[in-house]
Amino acid sequence: MAAGLLPSARAVLALLFLGLALLSVGPAPAQALHNVTAELFGGEAWGTLAAFGDLNSDKQTDLFVLRERNDLIVFLADQSAPYFKPKVKVSLKNFSALVTSVVPGDYDGDSQMDVLLTYFPQNHSNNELGAVIFWGQNQTLDPKNMTILNRTFHDQPLIMDFNGDLIPDVFAITNESSQPQILLGGDLSWHPALTTKSKMRDPHSRAFIDLTEDFTADLFLTTLSASNTFQFEIWENLGGNFSIRSVFEKPKNLVVVGQSAFADFDGDGHMDHLLPGCEDKDCQKSAIYLMRSGTGQWAPVLQDSSNKGTLWGFVPFVHEERPTAIPVPLTLHIGDYNMDGYPDALAILKNTSGSNQQAFLLENVPCNNASCEEVHRMFKVYWDLAGLNLIKDAMVATFFDIYEDGTLDIIVLSKGYTKSDVAIHTLKNNFEADAYFVKVIVLSGLCSSDCPRKITPFGVNQPGPYIMYTTVDANGYLKNGSAGQLSQSAHLALQLPYNVLGLGRSANFLDHLFVGIPRPSGEKSIRKQEWTAIIPNSQLMVIPYPHSVPRSWSAKLYLTPSNIVLLTAVALTGVCVFILAIIAILHWQEKKADDREKRQEAHRFHFDAM
């Protein structure tokens, strides 16, 4: 190349390297939330969101919304705006009832989603709940095809898989006995569940989740001791039978006790027990305690709830004999907002010196004080999250993957739409960072390729499966994560029928992903299967068929390109075009230089000849 071209080439190459440097830096993480309520619901954004599930088996999650005390409206996900449309309706108006809970599930084992409703009858003099099941047919609900259960409940039931047949069962205290009873799905027959001297707490926060690290869901109960002290019991699933393993009390400092929640808080692959509450009866001083798996010791992970001189606290549960609206206990809703592999939470806090209550994001961050040193992590309240702090009089806040892209967005319910109904707000999570995820849903496995009408039952909402992964993080260290599927069902638990597990900034394949399901009485071997080399940013649908032969289970993998991947593809295409342009320019300049040199050589030849 001619020497005269070097400066221009250096300039072009400098521009190229500058572009590549800017590409490698990428956009700064966005923290704001974008309100997309009108885009999702149009003018229908009201009612109490009570449950999630895929009613019509189209692999998109639908919303179950209660309106006007006794109507259930199912908003089906659609491809065009508004993206959730009210398509299915069933009503208990003839019962003059207040519906208190909605639990979708396949209660007869036909691979169609049914819906269990609990309700207060109009004359609820004994304060007990009635229950009715609307049966699914042709991927919808038939308002006339229903079964009224012949027993009433002392509290909202826990939906679990008691006998390991992967048909949901109903666990509750009924009017027939002070001992827990189980309504087995399929034949709808009642049986004694457990024999215990403990009295069940109301409102309870029972759970069906693996707490003994064997991939088999155990039974967690919230009870009262003989001295009326709050306590917790773990009934271990041993060979398909439940036997009591441990009993422990609440933290001594807590006066008001909220609903237990479960998450792999410290990212070690095992479930931890989170307990929100207050250290005084007026909730002037709120806290969240954590019991790490297997330790038996409580440690505070949130104690400071003041912001700029204003003290915020949890909203204590008020027990009403004759409620006029759905009671909402003190609850945390768990989800990995920023996909860093450490689950965050949403909570409702009230200004202790005023009347306003708002939803706040509690971010899971490394511990920075002595009290949480043992668990290494803590919650930090995100006080100024744009979008969330604009919603006043919030009642409930939960996570939901609105656009099925693996990012957990936020839904908030707030008072004030009407006297008996609330407003729905949906906030898109604009968090953009170099983080990855895997989304896992475990189906019932009641059928595989021979499902009725050839429709795979994506939406049967299966309680009990347990998921764990192991991978290597960006620094080369081993990283674990775990979650239980639909472990709680009562008191607006609002758990998703899938799990989104954050992987942090590691784009490595998941080395191992394990899935375990409940097993029936008498079966000693654990039902667990392992998959290897799972691609990040993918959705895995596990079909555990047949149940007792894990090596025969199948998994369908769906890739979900994130915005980062798409932006990178666009930027890479731009860089390639830029490089081709540079090559063309340099080639053209090289050709010009060669032509000039040839002319000079020709002139020199003629001069020498003369």
UniProtKB/Swiss-Prot annotation:
Transmembrane stretches, start-end: 564-584
Cysteines joined through disulfide linkages: none
Signal peptide: 1-32
Glycosylation sites: 35, 94, 123, 138, 145, 150, 175, 241, 351, 369, 480
Organism annotation: Rattus norvegicus (Rat)
Protein localization: Secreted; Cell membrane
Similarity remark: Belongs to the TIP family.
Entry function: Modulator of T-cell function. Has a protective effect in graft versus host disease model.
Membrane topology category: Single-pass type I membrane protein
Gene3D superfamilies linked to this entry: Integrin alpha, N-terminal
Principal location: secreted
Self-association state and partner proteins as the record states: Interacts with RUVBL1, RUVBL2 and alpha-tubulin.
FG-GAP repeat start and end residues: 98-135, 153-183, 256-291
Keywords: Cell membrane, Glycoprotein, Membrane, Repeat, Secreted, Signal, Transmembrane, Transmembrane helix
UniProt name for this protein: T-cell immunomodulatory protein
